[in-house]
From Swiss-Prot:
Listed GO biological process terms: tRNA 5'-leader removal
Gene Ontology MF term list: 3'-tRNA processing endoribonuclease activity; ribonuclease P activity; tRNA binding
Any GO CC annotation of this UniProt entry: ribonuclease P complex
Key word tRNA processing present: yes
Assembly description: Consists of a catalytic RNA component (M1 or rnpB) and a protein subunit.
Catalytic reaction annotation: Endonucleolytic cleavage of RNA, removing 5'-extranucleotides from tRNA precursor
Function text: RNaseP catalyzes the removal of the 5'-leader sequence from pre-tRNA to produce the mature 5'-terminus. It can also cleave other RNA substrates such as 4.5S RNA. The protein component plays an auxiliary but essential role in vivo by binding to the 5'-leader sequence and broadening the substrate specificity of the ribozyme.
EC number: 3.1.26.5
Protein name stated in the entry: Ribonuclease P protein component
Family: Belongs to the RnpA family.
Keywords: Endonuclease, Hydrolase, Nuclease, RNA-binding, tRNA processing
Catalytic class of the enzyme: hydrolase
Pfam families: Ribonuclease_P (PF00825)
Gene source species: Aliivibrio fischeri (strain ATCC 700601 / ES114)
Amino acid sequence: MNYDFSRELRLLTPEDYKFVFKQAHRAGSPHFTILARENSLSHPRLGLAVPKKQIKTAVGRNKFKRIVRESFRNKQHSLPAKDFVVIAKKSAQELSNEDFNKLLDKLWHRLSRPSRG
């Protein structure tokens, strides 16, 4: 199995993001929200939204993105064929890396279950 985070595993265009925002299933926490929507591909894709307004420093924004990408990269083979967008909130920078990863795992699992609607 390949665990890289190649270009095909990313949401690249504004249209990709709009597609997810239009009719997304949400899984949230006080620290970040993950939106998910089925895609027509055979693999999941990830997009990140980390506003300067929420996480002020570039170091904080980069850390958030690095942790989310790493978690996605390791979970990609167990995730369904959906497009995911992770949106940061202010309190995300207060989490330790360990707590951050536990919370991400919980939300990935929640969004991996078949939807009821």
